[in-house]
Amino acid sequence: MNALTLTPGALTLKQLRGVWRHPTPLVLDENAHEAINQSVACVEAIVAEDRTAYGINTGFGLLAQTRIATHDLENLQRSLVLSHAAGVGAPLDDNMVRLMMVLKINSLARGFSGIRLSVIQALIALVNAQVYPWIPSKGSVGASGDLAPLAHMSLLLLGEGKARWQGEWLPAKDALKKAGLEPITLAAKEGLALLNGTQASTAFALRGLFEAEDLFASAVVCGALTTEAVLGSRSPFDARIHAVRGQRGQIDAAAMYRHVLTDTSEIADSHHNCDKVQDPYSLRCQPQVMGACLTQLRHAAEVLLVESNAVSDNPLVFAEQNEVVSGGNFHAEPVAMAADNLALAIAEIGALSERRIALMMDKHMSQLPPFLVRNGGVNSGFMIAQVTAAALASENKALSHPHSVDSLPTSANQEDHVSMAPAAGRRLWEMASNTRGVLAVEWLAAVQGIDLREGLKSSPLLEQARQTLREAVSHYDDDRFFAPDIEKAMELLDDGRLVALLPPVL
């Protein structure tokens, strides 16, 4: 694996997706060292001059007015990390932990946090050695930063807590020792710089974005397959229709459908002069609905890319002016709203897919055997698979409720408005899994429907999608144990087998 040279503030979505998907060695751009060192010098000057500055020689939250003696500053930072590591729930997997750590490294290395280069390099060493801290998935409200998750991340630097090394959970000190690493001691402000920030919220939402992007592409292919299976018209994808409306997402979505449908299709030729005037909305309005979803994905991508490269701790060190300034960049409201928009898109992608599945079940609408199987009555075919899709799509409607409008005061009302961004992002994973299940059923159903079209072939790309599935799941001549087929189709979707048929979505 080639190392990623981290230029602070310049990470791309492609790089972040790679970090999420697989271990990625990091090298910090040497040009970042000067800004980091200057911010540390500013903090050290404040301590030496005995000036009062929040987070450097004061307490935190409601205790910000409490002045801390110089000889207690190291203990202050250690106590902060220990006390704030109060999360609950299942631990995050290695991929999520790695993404979160890289986001934190990227932010700290911008040089506005007053944290030593050696501490940043210690975090990089953990990533490179694949020593991952035990971080519970719950416990942050997304302001003042993701305190609990980032505290659990930071415990490992101190040799506290637990960590995973080579797939095994170990006491942190043991994991560090096995990896040839040593615990460190934090200096003034460094604990707060590590804990304060939106990196957990952003990592959660980024995973949702990456999964939504793949689901969108897969849904375009599945929708096109269904269009072919039920002898749907291609006229709704005509570029002129979408050009006169002018919605960019819709225009681009229609182009994606045209890309996979093309003009070379025996199925399309077979009903070119039929009497059917218009298709149901779940077919005809695919560009409009999916285009709106694409617009939401692109907006969320823009917000999350900015946040991935942001400095979001507090206070911030402006070394050129020799000032430490308190603000609120830790508030993850932009991330929460982006995650809420992603939730709407993921829910709608699944909801539209489920309606297409239902259409295929109805012999009057699809012109196919009931429930896509011969000898109906003896065979039930896709009857209950469609029910499963309906259950998943409906569940997502409840999960898509916005989190960004929720707030609950914390820290004795000092932190009286919060974003709930972590929960907003985390629920996207379950929603993505649900929509993947719906699309798996549609893929199975649409390919079965095309199989039943008397040997006619679809477009070249859709035939690839059909062949990919048929190499793993055979045609349904009679009823059989259905769940393993859905599971297999979901695995293929998760592996990006349909995504590869389209140009990049974002």
Curated annotation (Swiss-Prot):
EC id: 4.3.1.3
Record-linked InterPro entries: Aromatic_Lyase, Fumarase/histidase_N, HutH, L-Aspartase-like, Phe/His_NH3-lyase_AS
2,3-didehydroalanine (Ser) modification, residue list: 144
Keyword Cytoplasm included in the entry's annotation: yes
Source domain of life: Bacteria
Substrates-to-products reaction catalysed: L-histidine = trans-urocanate + NH4(+)
One annotated GO molecular function: histidine ammonia-lyase activity
UniProt GO BP: L-histidine catabolic process to glutamate and formamide; L-histidine catabolic process to glutamate and formate
Description of post-translational modifications: Contains an active site 4-methylidene-imidazol-5-one (MIO), which is formed autocatalytically by cyclization and dehydration of residues Ala-Ser-Gly.
Keywords of the record: Cytoplasm, Histidine metabolism, Lyase
One Pfam family it belongs to: Lyase_aromatic
Statement: the UniProt record of this protein carries the keyword Transferase: no
Cellular localization per UniProt: Cytoplasm
Pathway(s) of this molecule: Amino-acid degradation; L-histidine degradation into L-glutamate; N-formimidoyl-L-glutamate from L-histidine: step 1/3
Record's GO cellular component terms: cytoplasm
First-level EC class: lyase
Position of the 5-imidazolinone (Ala-Gly) cross-link: 143-145
UniProt cross-references to NCBIfam families, sorted A to Z: hutH, PRK09367.1
Cited HAMAP family: His_ammonia_lyase (MF_00229)
Family of this protein: Belongs to the PAL/histidase family.
This protein's name: Histidine ammonia-lyase
GN (gene name): hutH
